[in-house]
Amino acid sequence: MLIREVRADEYGLLSELAVSAKRHWGYPERWMEIWTPQLTFAYDYFEEHEGWAAIDDEKPIAFYTLEDNNGIAWLENLWVLPEYIGRSVGKELFHHATALARGRGYKSLQLEADPNALGFYERMGMKKIGERHSDVDGTPRILPIMEIAL
């Protein structure tokens, strides 16, 4: 597996990857309809956002974006194709992101986690530092805000 920068022309593939990864958690189809526009990247998204992809057999199998959030590294869009979940792909990308952020002088990395991914991020050493209350189609959700010191 190779990790490389996302190419701007991969926005369609990565949109499909993100939707597939979200659908893996068994969310209701109505919720997926609501979320799909948020998981669909515009053609210029990766020209404006730094993204890194895990590549297997010359195709993206997972990716993340890294942003500056008021001096804190913010990990966004860590998605893994369902058939690669449990094969250390997410772990490798997470370690890549923390090393990249640390190398740039950030003291911590934060993210907002899907509740289904909470255990993964805890295994990566992250701690819950807060939460964001949300709702989808009238159903309340609590999204944990996680942090790891670099």
Which functions belong to the PLM regions below?
Residues 59-67, 74-79:
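Conserved beta-strand in the GNAT
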Residues 50-62:
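Conserved beta-hairpin
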Residues 16-41:
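Conserved GNAT-fold acetyl-CoA-binding loop/helix
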Residues 2-16:
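A short beta-loop-alpha structural element at the N-terminal edge
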Residues 101-113:
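Conserved GNAT acetyl-CoA-binding A-motif
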Residues 84, 88-96:
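Conserved acetyl-CoA pyrophosphate-binding loop and the N-cap/start of the following alpha-helix
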Residues 121-122, 126:
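Conserved active-site tyrosine of GNAT-family acetyltransferases
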Residues 110-112, 127-145:
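Conserved catalytic-core motifs of GNAT/GCN5-like acyltransferases
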